[in-house]
Amino acid sequence: MKTFKFFKILLTFLFVFVSTQSFAKTIKWSMQGDSLTLDPHAQNEGPTTQVSRQVYEALVTRGLDMTIEPQLATKWSTTDPNTWIFKLREDVKFSDGSKMTSRDVVFSILRAKQRTSDFKEYISTVSGVEAIDDYTVKVTTSKPNPILLNQLSNIFVMSRDWSEKNFAVTAQNWDAGQETFSATNAMGTGPFKITLREPNTKTVFKRNKHWWGDMKDNKVTEIHLLPIKNAATRVAALLSGEVDLVTDAPVQDLARIGSSSAHKVNSTAQMRTIFLGMDQAADKLRTGNTGDNPFKKKEVRQALYQAIDIEAIKK
């Protein structure tokens, strides 16, 4: 059995919290946005994924040192460059007490490959997935894929029975505004389950008594997510004690928060690349009044690059 720290479960880049709590039973957590949907395959977006990770798990995950670690799979191997064999944990249950088996993994990977899934590009090389037995899954790729484990760390496993019962076998079409049961309800194998959902206001997570893991910070039995869009208001809520944990504190406020004896600033590495994209193809920009598209000119793109203070970003 593996021990997980509460912060590892949140899997965030930078967070500040009230250090005097040593963590109470209920943690009030805030960030800028809320989850767009509870469907774990519908939207690949920061706050949405953070919420999903409290409830759902994948075959593998990344540790705090960014290495690939077992999660629902205990081990894996390749029999040839295009064939992967995953051995699953045999003590995993969903939060309703039902067992997780290879049929749930097969269902989830195929669901994540659907047209409406926002995670389909992660597993675009997966050409087949098969349950060898209750706790063995074979994944076949159309070509060698050395980063498949990294990609599978983002594919959350759902209960096939729960999805079929609630007409949620297809990933929510979020772009079309589709409303589905899986968009407003969640049931996974993770350390928490959702007991209250008020979008953009409050989401309550309670400990999943069926979780296979062992939470080191076992005093935490409940988490209240309270999204606060305005950065200044969010920081004020932290400093006043209205919330205990903020996972996206503004950089300019970190020194002030850290100077408080009642608060602590922690940071971890993360697998994320932020980039600036420019439309170099269109003759005219979709917005603005510049006339011809300036980004078609190499000199303009170079000027934009020179204007970026890279050293300041590094700091």
Please name every model-derived segment.
Residues 61-64, 89-119, 128-130, 191-315:
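Extracytoplasmic/periplasmic ligand-capture domains
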Residues 18-24:
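Sec/Tat signal peptide C-region and signal peptidase I cleavage site
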Residues 77, 121-171:
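Surface-exposed binding/hinge segments that line
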